[in-house]
């Protein structure tokens, strides 16, 4: 079974990686600096090997651990090194669609920006989305949409389900 994760920035089957669309540390640092200025938000830095959080608010930690089984608490997200950085997930206590997305949608010219749930939004490398990743994998495997089964549970799965 092949899994497409982190908004399409990563795909793997067992130990075989099919796709990895990471972001460089400087880019991620700039994004984190901007997000930290938005009231009511907490950040998950999603890497290939683990997710990283610095905020310790109980509701946020509970929500982050619900979606990331490998989740490390760190003193500062900017100190994370040695992992491929795939996505920044923003948890917004005030509602992603109403609060953080309007303040971050200007990033869409250079990044994939998606509201992924009532309180979640994601920022990843431009072109990283589950539909495009699925299409690439279908081409590599020589299979059609009719021969593909997908499962999704959030708004960021829509492009994959349509594919």
Tell where the protein language model's regions lie, with residue ranges.
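Conserved acidic, metal-coordinating active-site core of Asp-based
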Residues: 30, 34, 38-151, 155-160
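Alpha-helical substrate-recognition element adjacent to the catalytic core
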Residues: 1-25
């Amino acid at each position: 079974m092949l899994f497409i994760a982190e908004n399409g920035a990563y795909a793997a089957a067992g130990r075989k990686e099919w796709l990895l669309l990471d972001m460089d540390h400087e880019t991620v640092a700039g994004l984190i600096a901007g997000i930290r200025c938005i009231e009511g938000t907490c950040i998950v830095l999603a890497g290939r090997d683990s997710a990283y959080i610095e905020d310790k608010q109980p509701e946020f930690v509970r929500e982050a651990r619900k979606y990331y089984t490998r989740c490390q608490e760190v003193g500062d997200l900017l100190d994370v090194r040695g992992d491929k950085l795939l996505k920044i997930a923003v948890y917004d206590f005030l509602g992603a669609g109403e609060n953080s997305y309007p303040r971050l949608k200007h990033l869409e010219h250079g990044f994939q920006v998606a509201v992924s749930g009532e309180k979640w939004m994601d920022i990843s490398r431009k072109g990283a989305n589950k539909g495009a990743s699925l299409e690439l994998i279908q081409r590599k495997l020589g299979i059609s949409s009719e021969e593909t089964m997908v499962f999704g549970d959030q708004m960021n799965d829509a492009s994959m389900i349509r594919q």
